[in-house]
Amino acid sequence: ILKELNWDLDSILITHHHSDHIDGVDRLRSLTGAKVTGAKSDAHRLPKLDFSVAEEDIISVGNEKAQILDTPGHTIGHISYYFRNDNKIFTGDSLMSLGCGRLFEGSHKIMWKTLKMFLQLPPETMIFSGHEYSISNAKFALSVDPKNERLILREKEIQTLLKNELFTVPTSLELELETNPFLRASLPEFKANLNMKNN
């Protein structure tokens, strides 16, 4: 594909150690010479890293700069790459369209801290996740937030996009704030839907 598009691959950014994110990294590196970046704290579970990074580190990716954010929960060593100047973030499996990654290693408290960190980003931030689970996540979101008019509309928009073989990601933080149940979990109206205490 790279040859067909006349593109060069010079950077591989790893968010976490799961096989669906790292299988093929060594082969890609050998074919392209791309440099591999990943979390220093998780290096023992990752392919050989050219750059080991930690929270707040700034790296160069092409002509852009990315800030490393610790985003544990899905896995303990999960990181995200925040391109502040472009309002883009590569979240891997920590935050997705209408959802977040399952807790394989972290706790609910750890994941909640990560989700609250995402809430601090500018609403115009574009979220590039590691998977496109938009339709299944929409069905779950509607099961816990059935009166959310924007969510109802979004589920229809997703159906239309998929019917036309179009992507549903990236998404914007602004849209996620309106429709993602994991980012809305502290809102009184959301808690009321689930008969949760407001504390």
Language-model segment annotations:
Residues 1-7, 46-145:
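Catalytic core of the metallo-beta-lactamase
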Residues 1-67, 153, 157:
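Active-site HxH/HxHxD metal-binding segment of metal-dependent hydrolases
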Residues 39, 75, 172:
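Residue-level signal for threonine
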Residues 13-15, 34, 131, 166-167, ...:
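Intrinsic structural disorder
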Residues 12, 25, 49, 56, ...:
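Surface-exposed loop/turn and secondary-structure junction residues enriched for glycine/proline
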Residues 116-126, 135-199:
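Accessory terminal helices/loops
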